């Protein structure tokens, strides 16, 4: 699943389950907990606020075609600079959500439960309707007539964060911050806006800030599902895995349901406990009722299956997700990835092209570029280069709207661009947070810069938790090989291919080549 960081995410988050909550995953025999009828929170911020809720920031690209065109314009205007950076390793997850890295997005959690509202307020349920643009339009119209409705301002801020995340449109983040600021100005310290501030901080990869705001909410409302979920995400993305595990247990005891179950599962996956992760996700899927919940959890199961090299199961889960929501981006990406791993190159390229046409986000752009490289038809090298260039353009746009994209830059430049830039970005990200993903990125950046002795401890740290990730094992194996640890290198490379033989169109090929040379 991915943080979110990449966080995620990812990539939309599930709506809150409104029926009786299912059993906690840590004790399948326990009686079903009663649903907690606590109001769920939305968003907060700190900037000057536009009085008109529909006002667009300067140069904001609200329509998909315009957004893609904007990315391409930035790309065209910075060809010389972008040629030095390029690409993104196919193993990365935009998490992250959210990411968090596993975060397909910690943004739709609990949106099926209304916050305490002023008369005539627009419920956050509106965001679960399936048409985010229509929801935003309705909120804007409502706020023109009820400009002092602090809850609806918070809900609008949350909607902008969700729109930025799902459409690859970072220019929405300043609007989200303005809406959340407006909510806080009208009602200082309100839970909805504080929780939204946690979501916005996470979306911008400010995980320390996300944790701070989540803790503020939980101090006043220990049962806030959104804040409990955001706290787990932030701890995971900060590499505080023991604390994240405790936070997941606490959240499960207080607010068992789909948002908490998915995070509980990911914490176990990071520790190598795939069996528990799968069981919890299957339980969550069995209790899911909304289309958003079904697509989110089924996609998480698909990603888990793909990570273990079980492509048939992955495709089954992605089909389940797309049956619930045929436009769900993470499921479309995942399906193309699984098709590529199974050898259905044509379907994989077609699917990833469709994803990129709609949402030019870093991971699908790079994966499409690597699929072109692996195919090797006439013109494919240029097509691949174009995708990598768009990644660099997107990173530039993200930085301009306050999003920390150093992890994306490190992975991108290491595989397809300027290696010095890769190392600089990886070091910057490592200085902020120590996670398995940042350890892997720093190890690989050091490796491509010929600093393998320095790289090896980080490569080993990336695999130390037991997390089953073939790309991490591949990176470790190549670094071990470069440092003369031939026996360990063969074991790591073999483990990568045994785990997930199609983990990357290019990386898997290099792993097989290195193993052949080592014989």
Predicted regions and their residues:
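Canonical tetratricopeptide repeat
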Residues: 155, 196, 230, 263-264, ...
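Residue-level recognition of tetratricopeptide repeat
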Residues: 158, 162-165, 199, 233, ...
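TPR alpha-solenoid repeat register
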Residues: 152, 193, 227, 260-261, ...
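N-terminal leader/linker segments that initiate helical-solenoid repeat arrays
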Residues: 2-25, 29-34, 39-187, 191-192, ...
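Short coil turns that delineate tetratricopeptide repeat
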Residues: 147, 188, 222, 255-256, ...
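Residue-level detector of the short coil/turn that links helix A to helix B
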Residues: 164, 171, 205, 239, ...
């Amino acid at each position: 699943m991915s943080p979110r960081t990449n966080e995620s995410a990812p990539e939309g988050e599930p709506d809150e389950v409104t029926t009786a909550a299912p059993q906690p995953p840590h004790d399948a025999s326990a009686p079903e907990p009663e649903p907690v009828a606590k109001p769920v929170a939305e968003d907060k911020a700190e900037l000057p606020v536009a009085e008109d809720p529909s006002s667009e920031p300067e140069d904001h690209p609200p329509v998909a075609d315009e957004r893609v065109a904007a990315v391409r314009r930035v790309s065209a205007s910075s060809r010389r600079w972008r040629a030095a950076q390029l690409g993104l390793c196919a193993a990365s997850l935009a998490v992250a959500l959210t990411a968090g890295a596993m975060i397909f997005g910690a943004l739709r959690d609990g949106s099926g439960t209304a916050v305490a509202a002023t008369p005539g307020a627009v419920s956050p349920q509106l965001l679960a309707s399936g048409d985010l643009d229509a929801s935003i339009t309705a909120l804007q119209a409502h706020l023109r007539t009820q400009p002092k409705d602090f809850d609806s301002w918070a809900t609008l801020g949350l909607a902008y964060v969700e729109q930025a995340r799902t459409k690859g449109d970072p220019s929405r983040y300043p609007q989200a911050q303005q809406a959340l600021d407006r909510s806080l100005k009208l009602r200082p310290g309100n839970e909805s806006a504080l929780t939204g501030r946690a979501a916005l901080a996470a979306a911008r990869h400010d995980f320390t800030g996300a944790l701070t705001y989540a803790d503020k909410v939980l101090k006043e409302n220990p049962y806030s599902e959104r804040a409990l979920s955001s706290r787990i995400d932030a701890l995971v993305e900060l590499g505080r895995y023991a604390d994240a595990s405790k936070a997941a247990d606490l959240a499960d005891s207080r607010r068992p349901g789909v948002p908490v179950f998915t995070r509980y599962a990911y914490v176990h996956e990071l520790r190598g406990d795939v069996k528990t992760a799968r069981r919890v996700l299957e339980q969550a899927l069995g209790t899911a009722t909304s289309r958003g919940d079904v697509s989110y959890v089924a996609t998480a199961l698909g990603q888990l299956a793909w990570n273990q090299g079980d492509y048939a199961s992955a495709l089954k889960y992605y089909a389940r997700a797309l049956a619930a929501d045929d436009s769900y981006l993470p499921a479309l990406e995942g399906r193309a990835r699984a098709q590529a791993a199974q050898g259905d190159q044509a379907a994989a390229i077609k699917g990833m092209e469709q994803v990129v046409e709609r949402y030019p986000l870093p991971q699908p752009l790079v994966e499409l570029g690597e699929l072109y490289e692996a195919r090797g038809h006439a013109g494919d090298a240029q097509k691949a280069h174009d995708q990598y260039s768009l990644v660099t353009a997107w990173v530039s746009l993200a930085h301009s709207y306050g999003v920390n994209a150093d992890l994306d830059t490190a992975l991108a430049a290491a595989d397809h661009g300027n290696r010095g830039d890769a190392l600089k970005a990886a070091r910057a990200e490592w200085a902020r947070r120590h996670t398995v993903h940042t350890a892997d990125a720093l190890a690989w950046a050091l490796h491509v810069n010929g600093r393998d002795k320095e790289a090896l401890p980080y490569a080993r740290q990336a695999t130390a938790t037991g997390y089953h990730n073939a790309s991490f094992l591949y990176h470790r194996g190549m670094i071990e090989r470069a440092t003369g640890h031939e026996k360990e290198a063969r074991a790591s490379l073999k483990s990568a291919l045994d785990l997930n033989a199609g983990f990357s169109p290019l990386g898997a090929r290099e792993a097989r080549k290195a193993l052949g040379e080592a014989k």
